[in-house]
Amino acid sequence: MKTRQKTLLTLLAVAISGIMQSAHAETVLRRGNGSEPKTIDPQIAEGTPEANIMLDLFEGLTTRDGAANIIPGVAEKWDISADGKTYTFHLRHTTWSDGTPLTAADVVYAWQRDVDPAAGGKYGFLLYPVKNAQAIAEGEIKDLSQLGIKALDEYTVQVELEASTPYFLDMLTHASTAPVPQHVVEKHGKAWIRPENIVSNGAYKMTAWQPNAHITLAKSDTYWDKDTVKIDQVIYYPTEDKNTEIKRYRAGELDMTYEIPDDQIKWLRENLKDELLIGPYLGTYFYGFNLTRPPFKDNPKLREALSLAIDRDIITGKITGVGEKPAYGMVPPGINGYDNYRPAYADL
């Protein structure tokens, strides 16, 4: 197995410098974004292209600063009980992009959608630390109001956990836990994410979505921290083919892209080294065994033997060569409270 790496080509420094040159000139960031998003509904979407856009449009109770530290998002502060099982979040008095107040009811509604099996979301498991979340997601409890979250008043949310969960605040930075505008979702149904309908609470709001062409976001004048948002417009360009996307970057059509063909990494390192950034990605690649039939079914010793035989250093250093790190477990490095597992045979 190998831990994943994130590759990024960016001319962002050049784009940002334009802000300093002219305080009144509109600054635009053109982002290559891989495949066309299927949806940008926070509780339904899955995949990196969708997440990139949603994190610009929506803000959860917590968020991260530039150093990846947990900081307040739409919740300006929170209290944690002595036993670590009760969190009380105090929301900012802010609004949705249509001017409607964002309240605790929107947070409760979003979390109930997240674990509702009828909604069809993929990330409800992130809320499993919350009381009754797993039972609701698995259909054992039908009443969504039994989820361990409630609005104490318009701007206070209380969450009850099954057990103390040290990483709970980290989980809340995921887009799937962001509040959604109940008044808009219930009015428009699945069409609520269309440009003419969508309402968001993040640093940006959507102004256009032309399928397979571009998605345009503009700085939101209702965002509580709008004065720190320095880029006026972000345009996401979907490109299914990585080679095409890198050509668009090199032609100056894109300011940044994460979609880089592995076979071009060496050339990019040699020729665009000041623009190429490779860093750890929170994920793990692995080989899976078919456990429904022989020889791997009911044969853990064989599976273990194959795992021992795989030279992870050869795979990461000679075959993929993008900078991945050898992996000896499913949990990648960088998880708070996790000590990297390295078995004795790794050094043989």
Can you describe what each PLM-predicted range is?
Residues 106-108, 119-183:
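Surface-exposed binding/hinge segments that line
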Residues 76-124, 158, 248, 296:
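Aromatic- and charge-enriched surface segment that lines or borders ligand/interaction sites
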Residues 154-155, 163-229, 233, 241-243:
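Gly/Pro-rich hinge or "lid" segments in bacterial periplasmic/extracellular proteins
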Residues 325-348:
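Structural transition elements
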Residues 35-51, 74, 122, 168-178, ...:
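A structural "hinge/loop" feature
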Residues 207-218, 235-294, 317, 326:
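Extracellular/periplasmic solute-recognition and catalytic clefts
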Residues 32-82, 112, 197-200:
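N-terminal lobe/hinge region of extracytoplasmic solute-binding protein
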Residues 104-110, 154-160, 202-203, 231-233, ...:
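Alpha-helical secondary-structure segments
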